[in-house]
Amino acid sequence: VFGVGQRTQDIYNADALSEILGKTVITRTFPEIVGREIRRIHQELVPFTQDERDVYQMAMKEFWKMRENYFSSTGNSRKDAMMRLIQQITLLLRISAAPDTVEEYQGSLPTKIRRVVDLAGRFENEIVAIGVRHKVVLDSYKAALEEAFPNRTVFAVTGGTTSFAQRRKLRKTLKESGNGILLCTQQSLPSSVNFEYVNRIIIPEMHYNNAGMSQFYMRFVRYTSTEKKDLYFPIYIGSLESNLMQMVLAKEKLTMFMKGQDADMDEIYAKFGVDYD
C-alpha cells in the first residue's frame, strides 16, 4: 500500500484504500471538532558550535570509541553487531537534544539549551511547558533553567520519581505559580490531567511520529481552550534531528490520509512551520 521516496512517502492504490477506510474508520480531527485551529507551530533552527559539532562528528565517525560508555554488551557478538546502528542513532539523537549529557563534550552550555532558556525567558510572566523524552536530558535542562531563573519555580516531573497523585496535584500548584516552568518527560503526564491554561509549549526532544508528541502537547491544547497555543521545536541544523523531522512529516501525511485528509507535503510543511528551501 505504501511506498517511500526521497522527501515523500507516497500512497499507492489510494482510491481502494480510501474506500476501505471510509467503511471502517470513524475519526475527526481537533480543528474539525472545535471549528478552528489554535495551534501555531514554530521551528527554532539552532546552529552547532564547534564543540557541539566535534562531539556529534565523533558519534558519527568514531562511535566505537563512545559505545561502551553508554551501552552494555548483550554478551552475544552477533546481537551486539545488530544493535550497533540503533545505538548510534540513539546516541546521535541524545547529543542533538543535549550535547552536555555525554562525557566527551568539552564545551559550555549547549546552544540548544540556551535557546530553550531564551524562549522561556521571553515569557517571563507566563507558565511554560517543556517536554523531553529521557531523564538524563531533563536533568541537563533543569540545571540550566534553575540557574537562569532563580525566581521562577521549575516543576520537574518524571514518571519514575513522581507519583500519579502528585502529578494530579501539580495542575493546581503550577497554575498558582503564575510563571512556573513545567519540565517533564513527555510520557509522564497522565491523560486524565490537563493543563489548558498553558499556552507556550517547547519540545526540544522529538518522538518518531507526531502521534507520540501529540499525546504530550494535547495535554495543553484542549477543546475548551480559548487562546492560541504556541508549540516550539528547537532543532540543530544539519543534525539527525532534521531527518527525524522529515520522517515525522512523512508519517503525518499517512496519518492524515487515514483520517480522510489527502494533504500534500507542502501543506504539511506549512502546518509544521517547515521551509525546506
Regions found by a protein language model. Give the residues of each.
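Short, solvent-exposed loop/turn segments at secondary-structure junctions
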Residues: 26, 51-53, 61, 95-101, ...
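Short helix-loop-beta junction
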Residues: 145-152
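Conserved helicase ATPase core of P-loop NTP-dependent helicases/translocases
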Residues: 131, 139, 152-186
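A conserved SF2-helicase RecA2
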Residues: 208-214, 221-277
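Conserved phosphate-coordination/catalytic loops
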Residues: 83, 106-114, 132, 161-168, ...
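SF2 helicase motor core recognition
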Residues: 138-142, 167-168, 180-205, 209-228
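Conserved RecA-like ASCE P-loop NTPase motor core of nucleic-acid helicases/translocases
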Residues: 127-134
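Inter-lobe coupling linker of SF2 helicases/translocases
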Residues: 1-105, 110-114, 118-125, 231, ...
